[in-house]
Regions:
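Short, contiguous alpha-helical
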Residues: 1-29, 68-127
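A generic short-segment signal for beta-strand/edge and adjacent turn/coil regions
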Residues: 35, 50-51, 67, 75-77
Length: 127
């Protein structure tokens, strides 16, 4: 659950920083009402929708403004969209490895996973 929350909170932070023109590194605490994976997914869906609308309204000038990220990077705001994407990809990969170790089925992420291919074969096999 902590990793899932990290993914959505970090993405929200990246988008908020791009919009504001400066990153705020204050913790984004998981709301008490967000206690399950389903809750996290719902929170993400709602926040992404708002963030996407706001990002879509940014001007070219805002998107090329150079933003500092913890003194580690100084990139145009638009570059942090890609940075955020790669951050999310990295952690989704982590989540997928945890699923199998916990006995879960790994869903299709980029093309079929072994588990999704097996499920597809099983669905096509007459019983």
């Amino acid at each position: 659950m902590e990793l899932a929350w990290h993914i959505v909170a970090a993405e929200h932070r990246f988008y908020g920083g791009i919009v504001a023109g400066v990153f705020d590194f204050a913790p984004i605490h998981q709301p008490e009402t967000v206690g399950t994976a389903r809750d996290i997914a719902q929170w993400y869906g709602q926040s992404f929708e708002r963030n996407f609308r706001t990002l879509a309204e940014l001007s070219g000038e805002q998107l090329v403004k150079v933003l500092d990220f913890r003194g580690l990077f100084r990139l145009p705001a638009v570059a942090y969209l890609n940075f955020s994407l790669h951050h999310t990809i990295h952690h989704r990969g982590q989540l997928s490895t945890y699923l199998r170790a916990m006995g879960g089925k790994v869903p299709s992420i980029y093309g079929e996973s072994h588990d999704s291919a097996e499920a597809k074969k099983a669905a096509q096999t007459p019983t």
